[in-house]
Amino acid sequence: MKPYKIPESVLVVIHTADLQVLLIERADRPGYWQSVTGSLDAADEPLPATAARELYEETGIVADGERIVLRDWHMSNVYEIYPVWRHRYAPGVTQNTEHIFSVEVPRDIAITLSPREHLNHVWLPHLEAADKCFSSSNAEAILQLPNNTKH
């Protein structure tokens, strides 16, 4: 039996200097667009390591710490896990804590999706990207992007 997911995750908003935001479409829910997300693999996995791992697994982008730098917003959201996904968690778990990160990338960066996880990707101005997200916490993070960039 597959182990239960840990109800702690990361959200990584990928953007360009001019606030174009990358969204990816879920393979298990076509039409559901989001930023990179993913749960900790182990309870002691550091959050920045989770963010870097998920960024690479879902987009092929490597956060090298020099050209591509993950920014920890030191913010988190607690939200209800959608009922359709609760079977992935231990019985009785209904909430997840999501930690927010962002990463600025060049506009021409190559994107390599994980086909089992995502179908398509699109770059959109941040306000349009926020409107397209199915998750309200993801949309809110994108709306806060202008206040959480190095510019």
Regions found by a protein language model. Give the residues of each.
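Conserved N-terminal beta-strand and adjoining loop/helix that marks the start
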Residues: 1-21, 43
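A small-molecule sensor/coupling module
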Residues: 141-148
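Active-site beta-strand termini and strand-to-loop segments that position acidic
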Residues: 14-17, 26, 103-105
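Catalytic cores of nucleic-acid ligases and guanylyltransferases
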Residues: 151
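A short gly/proline-enriched turn/hairpin at secondary-structure junctions
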Residues: 34-37
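Unchanged
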Residues: 40-137
